[in-house]
């Protein structure tokens, strides 16, 4: 297990603690649709409040690319934080400069201040030294409780630990503990389900898991790459042609490692002109219309995957298998969620899921509490699965010593 300085190792009373959270949560029309990532960080915030810290929360929302976009203001999460903490949460409309400095000077021990979206400043994603210096000047101690952002070499993830006494929050430690334990002791058959639309990084994941997994179930836009490789006509379905050759190499590698790659063999498609929805077989004779897209896996594919779930001892899931946000394209993710949950409840399956969309899909199915472990990480979860050291975790490891900060 990775050793990191914990909150109990740091004296925070009357100190300004810069607390990095991941408040990049799904919203529709300014309303939060899934507060999981906030809920999981509440114990860390409450600990800091109880121990007399001045808690300054920093985070990002969306990808404004260094520009101010009011629709991506973190002001939208203040009410949710207040409801979960049952205290007043102050908001600062800037993240660096005199405005947050003056707001922090007025803070009392046990109070909470949320700064504006860090990504409104380009220095955050660039890990710019000037931005790091300005941000670090606001606090006395840095705490990282954003596991889901710890794969990024950004200012608030890697820059701040180099400037301030640093520690890991409860959520970050919990993620590392659970994921390390699960993957170091994975019982077989070991099944991995990979879906979603982020294709490039997930192909790397597939390539690394071929030697570990017994079954690799590929769905969503990821599967479209393999279907295109087989020269299936998939209409306007999302995929990246430049990744087809990589998919071919992965299939060949899987053959030599006895890893079975499972692709959809039927699908739910939608014609975007007529809005007609049909179920089709995926084969070499398929001719999809140019304005039609694959939106979900079909019933035969669902049945096949459920059969694999029934014989699996460990399952890792990242990425929905269809466009679950839109009815009726949630069927695949819902059926798989319920099948995994049902077997997990018997005690014969260890089930792990990670990624914002995956969490939302499982939550929508009503069975999220039945999974063995739900990781808040998306990209961080994927990199951890590949055995990579996360930059944010490495930055904390470099600050490890036995001294307490007073």
From Swiss-Prot:
GO terms for molecular function: ADP binding; ATP binding; phosphoglycerate kinase activity. It is an enzyme of class 2 (transferase). This is Phosphoglycerate kinase. Pathway: Carbohydrate degradation; glycolysis; pyruvate from D-glyceraldehyde 3-phosphate: step 2/5. Keywords: ATP-binding, Cytoplasm, Glycolysis, Kinase, Nucleotide-binding, Transferase. Disulfide bonds: none annotated. It catalyses: (2R)-3-phosphoglycerate + ATP = (2R)-3-phospho-glyceroyl phosphate + ADP. ATP binds at residues 202, 325, 355-358. GO terms for biological process: gluconeogenesis; glycolytic process. It is found in: Cytoplasm. InterPro entries: Phosphoglycerate_kinase, Phosphoglycerate_kinase_N, Phosphoglycerate_kinase_sf. Substrate binds at residues 22-24, 37, 60-63, 119, 152. GO terms for cellular component: cytosol. Belongs to the phosphoglycerate kinase family. The keyword Cell division does not apply. Signal peptide: none annotated. PANTHER family: PHOSPHOGLYCERATE KINASE, PHOSPHOGLYCERATE KINASE 1, CHLOROPLASTIC-RELATED. Its EC number is 2.7.2.3. It comes from the Bacteria. Transmembrane segments: none annotated. Monomer.
């Amino acid at each position: 297990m990775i050793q990191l300085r914990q909150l109990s190792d740091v004296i925070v009373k009357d100190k300004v603690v810069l607390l990095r959270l991941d408040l990049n949560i799904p919203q529709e029309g300014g309303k939060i649709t899934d507060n999981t990532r906030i809920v999981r960080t509440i114990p860390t915030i409450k600990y800091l409040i109880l121990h007399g810290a001045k808690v300054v929360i920093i985070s990002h929302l969306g990808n404004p690319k260094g520009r101010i976009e009011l629709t991506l203001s973190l002001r939208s999460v203040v009410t949710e934080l207040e409801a979960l903490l049952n205290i007043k949460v102050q908001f600062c409309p800037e993240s660096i400069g005199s405005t947050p400095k003056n707001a922090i000077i007025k803070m009392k021990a046990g109070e909470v201040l949320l700064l504006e979206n860090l990504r409104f400043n380009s220095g955050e994603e660039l890990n710019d030294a000037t931005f790091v210096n300005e941000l670090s000047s606001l606090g006395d101690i840095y705490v990282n409780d954003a596991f889901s952002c710890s794969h990024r070499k950004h200012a608030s993830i890697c820059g701040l630990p180099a400037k301030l006494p640093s520690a890991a929050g409860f959520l970050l430690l919990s993620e590392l503990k659970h994921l390390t334990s699960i993957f170091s002791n994975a019982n077989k058959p070991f099944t991995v389900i990979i879906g979603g639309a982020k294709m490039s990084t997930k192909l790397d994941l597939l390539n690394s898991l071929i030697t570990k997994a017994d079954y690799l179930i590929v769905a969503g836009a990821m599967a479209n790459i393999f279907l295109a490789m087989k020269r299936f006509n998939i209409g306007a379905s999302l995929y990246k042609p430049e990744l087809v050759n990589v998919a071919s190499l992965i299939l060949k590698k899987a053959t030599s490692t006895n890893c079975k790659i499972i692709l959809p063999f039927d699908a739910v498609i939608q014609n975007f002109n007529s809005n007609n929805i049909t179920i089709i077989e995926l084969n070499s004779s398929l001719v999809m219309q140019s304005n039609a897209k694959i939106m979900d896996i079909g019933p035969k594919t669902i049945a096949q995957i459920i059969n694999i779930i029934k014989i699996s001892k460990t399952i890792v899931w990242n990425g929905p298998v269809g466009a679950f946000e839109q009815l009726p394209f949630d069927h695949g993710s819902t059926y798989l969620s319920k099948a995994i949950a049902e077997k997990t409840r018997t005690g014969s399956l260890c089930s792990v899921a990670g990624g914002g969309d995956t969490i939302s899909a499982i939550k929508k199915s009503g069975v999220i509490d039945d999974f063995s472990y739900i990781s808040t990480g998306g990209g961080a979860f994927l990199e951890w699965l590949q055995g990579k050291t996360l930059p944010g975790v490495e930055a904390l490891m470099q600050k490890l010593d036995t001294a307490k900060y007073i």
